[in-house]
Swiss-Prot record:
UniProt subcellular location: Cell membrane; Apical cell membrane
Protein family: Belongs to the major facilitator superfamily. Monocarboxylate porter (TC 2.A.1.13) family.
Tissue note: Expressed in cerebral microvessels.
Annotated membrane topology: Multi-pass membrane protein
Protein name as it appears in the record: Monocarboxylate transporter 8
Region of interest (2 X 22 AA approximate tandem repeats), ranges: 29-72
GO aspect biological process, one term: thyroid-stimulating hormone secretion
Modified residues (N-acetylalanine): 2
Residue stretches of biased makeup (Acidic residues): 33-45
Superkingdom of origin organism: Eukaryota
UniProt biased composition (Pro residues): 46-70
Coiled coil residues, start to end: none
Amino acid sequence: MALPSPASEEAEGPCQEANQEYQEPVCSPVPEPEPEPEPEPEPDPEPVPVPPPEPQPEPEPQPLPDPAPLPELGFEAEPVQEPEPTPTVETRGTARGFQPPEGGFGWIVVFAATWCNGSIFGIHNSVGILYSMLLEEEKEKNRQVEFQAAWVGALAMGMIFFCSPIVSIFTDRLGCRITATTGAAVAFIGLHTSSFTSSLSLRYFTYGILFGCGCSFAFQPSLVILGHYFQRRLGLANGVVSAGSSIFSMSFPFLIKMLGDKIKLAQTFQVLSTFMFVLTLLSLTYRPLLPSSQDTPSKRGAHTLRQRFLVQFRKYFNMRVFRQRTYRIWAFGIAAAALGYFVPYVHLMKYVEDKFKEIKETWVLLVCIGATSGLGRLVSGHISDSIPGLKKIYLQVLSFLLLGLMSMMIPLCRDFGGLIVVCLFLGLCDGFFITIMAPIAFELVGPMQASQAIGYLLGMMALPMIAGPPIAGLLRNCFGDYHVAFYFAGVPPIIGAVILFFVPLMHQRMFKKEQRDSSKDKMLSHDPDPNGELLPGSPTPEEPI
């Protein structure tokens, strides 16, 4: 409104001159034709410049286009909105946009996984028969060979657990098919070469190391690949694999005993190696539907080979799970129990042959262990689902207590029927202990770190599991019988059960302490009022004065 005022003053000047010139001719009518000053009102068009000041206020609204770039700044946020990376992530292995076929070719994969589990653990659970055959060969060279011969089967079983963290890395990097096929081929080579040597030290390497490591690399991918083909029916697929492998492995004690009676140990190794050869072919069916994970995000952030190595090392060897005190105690308790866990599998057959010489069907005991172990795996899964939180550990406590007591009961059995009852409980405890291991790991460290927690746990179990059978064999050499050896085998599981008993109590105590600390933090986390603290009893801060 103030801007047009200078223009109005400029307009008044010419108007006054025009009025003065016009008043003079009013007295004389002659100058009427002098309208020529009227053209001078043409300066009136000069008011036409008056609008130019009006555009001057218009430039002020023109800053309004300047805010218009602000949406452009907001528009630059669209790169965050880029959904292009998400399709690449979904196609690269995350299960978000992936729907398994829930059958079809997946049932062939289930059969391959069943063959894998059944053949591997059928041979390892029948190691007691192989141990007796090995002693018969070595007795001619050395009368006190129980300690040395026990290392063969113990090494093979221990390597399955010892290689677990490494196998998970290879499975993630190379995929299930390559890892499983390579592992089955190594297991075949280990078993087949064991038939060409009679040296105990060489069989430490061929059977204990090669066969054991190959079984570890072939076994874990058989469990991972099921998630590529099943999601809604994954429980059914796992149940078929567990039940099928249990039935499959129950036939191995009878088969190995029959082969041992008709042919020698070397030819028995050759026959068993054919199962690994078939497993090598079946592992080729592990066609991954979810590609193996790649490290492109890591490569973007790591420019040197050393940085990439550190990124991968921290990714695969994450030691944060050991910061959980309850996990450390739980892992230590299970590792302690593993010292006596594998002793009955190795020495039971030889003990029965020495004590019950009239019994020829000693392999029935291993069949009983395999049958109830499969039953325990099926039943314990349903029972653990109904038990909330870390109270599942009490199932492991009970299974370890029974396992220790049953191991101590073996020398006290006076007849073969009592041994059958003991073996039935041994297999049941084995099934309960193994099945609920993963759910407990999820409760302790969460789903993001559960796989690493299980891998570290299996690795910790390897050393005591390897050492247990040789120590029992050494005790047999020292005392002349297996009584002390089986008493020794029962002590570590009982100690492990006592340790595990305190894990839920400690976890609950730590949880309550965290709740108290968090409640204190919430009480102290209110923003202070400008005038000071809250008035006692007032729900709101004191208003500023």
